[in-house]
């Protein structure tokens, strides 16, 4: 619940009420979510939804996602930059509206991984540890997802 200040009577001292404001499913809600569903297009035209971890990029309305370099989502993004994103839970159940986006493969950086460690904390560190143990850390691909202007 977000509180909004609202004057009651201007003639006397100004009093403020707490008025709940219900936010629409906007970029703000997407940015504060733990996961979003990344919808990518296959060569046959069908679409695949994948729940992913993400962090905001320095650019406005842009996020970073990482995946295994051989994963289906990376292959699909190589073929089609068109994507859609929506807020979701850990299992991929969509909780918000789909928003058109553009996805591209980019080079990874330590700063981006530091942002993932900061956002996801211990869970990411455990995931990262086992990734290093299995040698999978060398097979990561960073994806930049930019929400299309409305």
What does each model-found stretch correspond to?
Residues 21-38, 59-61, 124, 145-150:
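Charge-dense, helix-prone N-terminal extensions
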Residues 24-26, 40-41, 129-133:
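Short, P/G- and charge-enriched loop/turn segments at secondary-structure junctions
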Residues 33-69, 83-86, 96-98:
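Short beta-strand segments
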Residues 2-37, 93:
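Extreme N-terminal tail/first-helix region
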Residues 69-142, 148:
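Short, structured beta-strand-loop surface elements
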Residues 13-23, 49-64, 149-150:
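Charged, low-complexity, helix/coiled-coil-prone segments
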């Amino acid at each position: 619940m977000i509180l909004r200040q609202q004057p009651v009577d201007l003639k006397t001292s100004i009093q403020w009420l707490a008025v709940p404001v219900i936010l629409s499913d906007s970029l703000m809600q997407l940015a504060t979510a733990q996961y979003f569903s990344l919808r990518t297009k296959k060569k046959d035209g069908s679409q695949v939804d994948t729940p992913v971890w993400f962090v905001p990029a320095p650019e406005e309305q842009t996020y970073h996602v990482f995946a295994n370099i051989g994963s289906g989502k990376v292959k699909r993004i190589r073929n089609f930059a068109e994507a859609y994103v929506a807020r979701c839970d850990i299992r991929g159940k969509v909780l918000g509206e789909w928003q058109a986006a553009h996805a591209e493969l980019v080079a990874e950086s330590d700063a981006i991984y530091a942002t993932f460690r900061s956002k996801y904390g211990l869970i990411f560190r455990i995931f990262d540890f086992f990734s290093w143990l299995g040698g999978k850390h060398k097979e990561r691909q960073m994806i930049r997802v930019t929400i299309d202007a409305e």
